[in-house]
């Protein structure tokens, strides 16, 4: 199990490339590195949380189209900025909101908790197995040659991002394509995950306060998943111009 210093060192190496901030200067990433998690199937608490998220999603949509939710609309604009088609590749928040009407997926209590927090706070949120990382996480615009470990028709395949696509990666390859669309198989959460990385993505109109509130909620809920859970967090944002962001 990593100690708190190792978690801090891991996050200290994380970075967002200047080319990404040039694309969206309003982008912020809040990273949580967590260990001491006790794996387990979904339970009454995680199911109740998902039900609350489903209710919140229906209230947020209020019968209207998902793409009119302000943060979803902002992410659709960001996807178009690097050449993706948001009607074909949806950000993770939009994908969950669209599923909420018929019921959010029940996977395991760790995945269920972070999916519910994503919907409740309307913020894209990814979770990955920290122990399977090779080096620190980096958000970059892809060269197009980086390997991406995924599956097609149930068969493991290696794909590559489009040149200029915004991707999360580590030293071994892409960990998430199109900012927050699809995660790699290599680093995905597993039934035996005890250390995890969570990435919360924000664009305007989401405020820093709202982003931190989502992280606080997630951290509090994760703390219930084991007697020795430890969490370290780091916020990454573009350097504000004088007079901006306080």
Which ranges hold each PLM region?
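Charge-biased, low-complexity intrinsically disordered regions
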Residues: 2-246
């Amino acid at each position: 199990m990593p100690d708190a210093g190792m978690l801090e060192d891991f996050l200290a190496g994380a970075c967002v490339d200047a080319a990404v901030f040039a694309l969206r200067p309003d982008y912020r990433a809040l990273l949580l590195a967590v260990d001491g998690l006790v794996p387990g199937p979904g339970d009454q608490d995680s199911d109740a949380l998902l039900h609350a998220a489903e209710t919140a999603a229906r209230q947020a949509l209020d019968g209207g189209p998902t793409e009119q939710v302000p943060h979803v609309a902002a992410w659709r604009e960001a996807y178009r900025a690097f050449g993706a088609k948001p009607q074909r590749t949806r950000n993770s928040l939009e994908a969950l909101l669209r599923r909420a009407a018929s019921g959010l997926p029940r996977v395991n209590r760790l995945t269920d908790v972070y999916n519910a927090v994503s919907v409740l706070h309307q913020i894209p949120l990814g979770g990955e197995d920290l122990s399977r990382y090779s080096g620190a996480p980096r958000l970059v615009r892809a060269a197009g040659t980086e390997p991406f470990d995924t599956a097609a028709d149930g068969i493991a395949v290696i794909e590559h991002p489009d040149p200029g696509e915004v991707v999360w990666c580590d030293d071994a390859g892409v960990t998430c394509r199109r900012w927050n669309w699809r995660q790699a198989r290599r680093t995905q959460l597993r039934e035996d995950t005890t250390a995890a990385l969570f990435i919360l993505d924000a664009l305007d109109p989401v405020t820093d306060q709202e982003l931190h509130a989502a992280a606080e909620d997630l951290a509090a809920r994760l703390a219930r998943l084991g007697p020795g859970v430890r969490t370290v967090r780091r916020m990454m944002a573009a350097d504000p111009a004088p007079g901006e962001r306080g």
